[in-house]
């Protein structure tokens, strides 16, 4: 059973790439044609890559791998949080802070600080502080929740990063590669497929395209962790 159909991808606008002048030649094998100055992605290739990605992610989840979803641009932010939470994964959807992976010890301390402030807020301890001090603590809490809220349950660096928009998330890519963390990446026509282990060529700007891909990857994680055999991604060859 196919993970996604051509009709679903067409409806989501997954085939629209960038203007031809903005392309990366390494993506040529995933491009069907150019139309009105815009590259059109070969959705047959995308379907194959989605099947491969589904099986790869499902297998990784089954073996206990931990996932981090990353996508900080406006179109991706809400979907990234929604799908990561649905499959019990961590996420970054506002801003990638330098050292989130490569300086994990410091980042973990900031996450612990966030948890402490949340406990203080829920217990009423902040409300009992002098007004000015309480306001400072609440501002700190809001800032930490915004940038680190999706990492509260991440006890160590992830095994896999699921990425939306490789070009925008350059720092996340560099940190993951430095630590040999596997990358599952949505790749638009301006991206470099050599920088990830699991490529998914598709439109990484359209909300519906992002939703389609991430929802299937979340399904794969849930299936790998909790069992169930719906046959997605399987080709009948075991």
Curated annotation (Swiss-Prot):
Keywords: Ribonucleoprotein, Ribosomal protein. GO terms for biological process: translation. Pfam families: Ribosomal_S2. The keyword Ribonucleoprotein applies. One of its GO terms (molecular function) is structural constituent of ribosome. GO terms for cellular component: cytosolic small ribosomal subunit. InterPro entries: Ribosomal_uS2, Ribosomal_uS2_bac/mit/plastid, Ribosomal_uS2_CS, Ribosomal_uS2_flav_dom_sf. PANTHER family: 30S RIBOSOMAL PROTEIN S2 PROKARYOTIC AND ORGANELLAR, SMALL RIBOSOMAL SUBUNIT PROTEIN US2M. Belongs to the universal ribosomal protein uS2 family. HAMAP family: Ribosomal_uS2_B (MF_00291_B). This is Small ribosomal subunit protein uS2. The lineage of its organism: Bacteria, Bacillati, Cyanobacteriota, Cyanophyceae, Synechococcales.
